[in-house]
């Protein structure tokens, strides 16, 4: 279960920031994420967070995916086709791999990611809404 929660955090990071040279624009984004895990005795609650992305965050998918450095996750097969971004990723230490797709409009995005964590599969659906410029705290 701990791996699934950590994986969920990684998925959120990917949805929020792993889009180098993508149509996503910098600023404050509200990200909603719903994980579906077959065989779980309960439904995972949706996650809703705000993420602030800079121009620098959007340049390198490898640097923009926050994860445990010990996991040594890599983003592979990263492609931008018009307003759609696709990718695959792998975290060998955690035996995690997956792929996903996100399609952007000017101020929204929708997408999905499928992950294999050991023997467990999960699908995450995303929606994102641009909320404006980031504010300093």
Which functions belong to the PLM regions below?
Residues 7-15:
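Bacterial N-terminal signal peptides
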Residues 1-4:
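Positively charged n-region of N-terminal signal peptides that target proteins for export
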Residues 6-7, 52:
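Short amphipathic alpha-helical "recognition" segments used for binding
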Residues 16-20:
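Sec/Tat signal peptide C-region and signal peptidase I cleavage site
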Residues 21-137:
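Subset-of-secretome marker
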């Amino acid at each position: 279960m701990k791996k699934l929660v950590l994986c969920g955090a990684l998925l959120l990071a990917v949805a929020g920031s792993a889009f180098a040279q993508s149509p996503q624009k910098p600023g404050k984004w509200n990200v909603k994420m719903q994980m579906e895990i077959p065989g779980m005795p309960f439904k995972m609650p949706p996650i809703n967070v705000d993420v602030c992305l800079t121009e620098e965050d959007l340049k390198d998918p490898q640097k923009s995916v926050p994860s445990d450095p010990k996991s040594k996750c890599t983003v592979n097969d990263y492609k931008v086709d018009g307003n759609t971004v696709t990718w695959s990723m792998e975290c060998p230490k955690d035996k995690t791999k997956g792929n996903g797709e996100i399609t952007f409009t000017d101020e929204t995005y929708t997408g999905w990611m499928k992950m294999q964590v050991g023997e467990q599969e999960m699908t995450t659906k995303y929606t994102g809404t641009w909320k404006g410029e980031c504010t300093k705290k």
